[in-house]
Amino acid sequence: AAKAIAQAMQELISVAAAGGGTVLILVIVLIVMCFAGMMLASDENDTEILPVSDEVKAYEPIIQKYAKEHGIPDYVLLIEAVMMQESGGRGTDPMQCSECNFNTLYPHTPGSITDPEYSIDVGIQNLADCLQIAQCESPLDMDAIKLALQGYNYGQGYITWAMNKYGEYTKANAIEFSLK
């Protein structure tokens, strides 16, 4: 796409130059550059947004309750996305948090939580703690949210390790941490 844009730009410039239209050349160059910038930006951020399942949506009142209780009421959509990723809202541990430190009622083995509401409470408490450790300032603080989400997945130790060693989340340092 970029090669075709460059070629078209060269052709337009030569046509405009032959007619002596300096202003026309500038206008054409600006238009082409704007178009090219939009195309390149859309290629880099081409992510499909999928809605959450009906199972996740059914938990929304419970999610709102515990999000408020744990001090993150503005993060309901993020919590729903975590649940969607972890379980699609299905099963007895929809937040997949049986192994986290906030689980005090069930064994710390995968799938041991048998109460969905308890899973949501524990998962939101864990996510709130991860967001706090990652120094997340708002639901728009994507760098801190990425760090917090990786900490939710790997354990909170990842967050402090990544912050101390690299100052941020990267895919490469997440892989490095997982190999330790």
What positions do the PLM features span?
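Small-residue-rich hydrophobic membrane-insertion segments
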Residues: 1-40
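Residue-level preference for non-acidic, small/hydrophobic
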Residues: 29-33, 82, 152
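Export/targeting segments at the very N-terminus of extracytoplasmic proteins
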Residues: 44-89, 117-124, 128-140
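Residue-level detector of well-ordered alpha-helical segments, enriched
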Residues: 74-79, 93-96, 144, 148
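Solvent-exposed loop/turn segments at secondary-structure junctions
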Residues: 85-90, 100-104, 154-159
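Short, surface-exposed glycine/acidic/tryptophan-bearing loops
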Residues: 90-110, 116, 168-175
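Extracytoplasmic/secreted cell-surface and envelope-processing proteins
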Residues: 91-93, 134-135, 157-162
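Catalytic and substrate-binding regions of cell-wall glycan-acting enzymes that process beta-1,4-linked
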Residues: 148-180
